Amino acid sequence: LGNLLWSYAKQAQLSLEVIEALGDDVNLVTTGRLAVYETSCLDNGEANIKGLFVEAARAAESFGLSQYTNQDLSNAVWAFATLGLLHSGLFKSVENEVKSRLTNNRTKFRGQEISNLLWSYATVNAQPDPSFIDAISYYVARECMGRNGIREKSLTSLFTQRQELANLAWGCAVVGQYP
């Protein structure tokens, strides 16, 4: 389900790249998140996109998020955020599931999954509970701590791209929680 939603959001982003490649032959009225949403609606129809994402959220919640991989959870909320859609119930359910996984040390998250999760919440102004940010910051600290504090090697093995760290910091700033 996460990959299906991801593909719809990615398609909208790629459509914008095509429009940008056409240069002066095309005039965009909007840019950024709104343009991605509009492109998606033009390609698939607004009712279809909204309907698909609402039904996907319902299915995810009824199926149970414990069955989803970390990447599925990350991809699902990323797709919603990329299109500028907020489904409060799904975001809250994902928040609770991720928090449970992080605090109970049930699974290892990759840096991209963590940063995309927080980026998604910040992008749609979902305002997660402070305990969600606390769980993320504790997990990152635990994964990166050495005997003498933070080891750069561990930090770079968790967050392989600078953009992931930037998204993490930006997400914390937007939701107003500073670990």
State each model region's role.
Residues 1-179:
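Eukaryotic RNA-binding helical-repeat scaffolds
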